[in-house]
Amino acid sequence: MHLIYFLFLVVGCSASLFDFIQNQFGGGGQAQKSPEHYEAQVLNSNCDKYLCPGTSLCVDAPKFCPCPYPSSQLRCFLPDGRYLCISKPAGDVAANYDDPRTNWKVDAKDDNIRDCGWVSRAWKGVV
């Protein structure tokens, strides 16, 4: 009788362990969406202005599109009116980039710190 209880215990623990491992390594997450799903989402949106390609948000103009990961990215404007998103600098200067209304204006004036000032200098070929 003890053998049966022991087997139930081992089987139960094994099932729990394998379920845990499957969830940790991607087995329990959502399936990736196909390009067709993304295309259908874009084509079926009710946006009558501009639909941001990275976030599917409806905004007045492309310059108002946010970065896909605003808590960890800066939106840097290029001289031709476009923008690109880069990772926020880390380390001692990271606090300078916390406010999304002003973080794109900060220029550390240091080519070792990749911020919007660095992007501007790189655009001009100075870096």
Swiss-Prot record:
Keyword annotations: Signal
Lineage start: Eukaryota, Fungi, Dikarya, Ascomycota, Saccharomycotina
InterPro entries: LCL2 (IPR034543)
Similarity-based family: Belongs to the LCL2 family.
CDD domains the record matches: LCL2-like
GO BP terms: ERAD pathway
Signal peptide: 1-15
Record function comment: Probable component of the endoplasmic reticulum-associated degradation (ERAD) pathway.
Protein name: Long chronological lifespan protein 2
